[in-house]
Amino acid sequence: MDGTGLCSYTYEPYEGCPYKVSKNGNKTWQAYAIEAKLVGANGFSISMMSCWLENSENMDAKQDCELKAFSRLAGELKKVYPRLPVLLLADGLYANQTFFGTCLKNDWHFIVTFKDGNLKTVWEEIGLLRPLHPGQKLDRVKEKNPVRGWLSEQLQYINDLDYAKYKLNWVEYKAWYERKEPHEYFSHLTDIRMDKSNAWEISRHGRLRWCIENEGFNTQKNGGYNLEHKFSRKNIGAKKNYYELLQIAHLINQLAEKLLHVKEHLKNCKVTLVALWEDMMACMRNQTIDNQELNQVMEEYKQLRY
């Protein structure tokens, strides 16, 4: 679960567009959406549902924000997928009672980034309990890189931390190569109780949140999808329509690009993904597709592996 700014304006592009006021009094309006994406270790970042930030017509009401949009999106997600097992990954903005309560009410698990300064009482409890749980501090050497040397990993976890009416579990992860500094550092809170058998896996799942930003938003902004382009400067309906079509296109491309045999083809033929798509588009533009042959292909049983 994460949000992103799509484009900014020096004028109000549509009614209800959120805005910020700078120190010198200048207003900047920004189209902003929050996304529920399905992410995986293989790089998938597939949009499941979107929600836009839009201010109320009531001028006295506070502006819409990402946390308010999350509550609306969570309600819709539960309504559409009432029995779907869900593990929500979210950044440090979501480490609050509203998020924890929503997950508990919907019977969802969560792993949320835990930043310094967030939930100070929880950090204080962690500081007190750290020395008391030496058996919950784990180390391992995972692999050797020919340039950077051995990769060392260290993890520590603590269960049953009290925050308001919630029981939280904390995990901290550090990783470094012997010839590279500084080390990687991640800290997460989760409702899933940990032990030596699952602590590494919980931390790894928490770090997959980066797929939303990297394989998701960053690819759509800088990978040819033109997410931030102002195709419509005044019509929010047109902007939303393009956004939804973009998510569908990105989904189709991911399902094609991440096939194992496509990856092997790119590796063996030393062809870039961009070049492969350009060749395919050129082929479709210049060749007539035979309906009989197409139907024959559609009727064949295929198993896709990722």
Question: What are the residue ranges of the model-derived segments?
Answer:
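Short, conserved catalytic/metal-binding motifs centered on acidic residues
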Residues: 1-6, 36, 70, 88-93, ...
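A short, flexible helix-boundary coil/loop motif
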Residues: 136-155, 221-241, 245-306
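An internal, acidic/charged active-site-proximal segment
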Residues: 56-172
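Active-site-proximal, Lys/Arg-enriched surface segment
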Residues: 1-42, 47, 51
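Short amphipathic alpha-helical "interface-anchor" segments enriched in bulky aromatics
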Residues: 196-231
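Active-site rim beta-loop-alpha module in soluble metabolic enzymes
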Residues: 184-195, 219
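Extended recognition/assembly regions associated with phosphoester-bond processing machinery
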Residues: 170-173, 181, 215, 253
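Short, structured patches in soluble enzyme cores that scaffold and shape functional sites
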Residues: 38-40, 52, 92, 112-116, ...
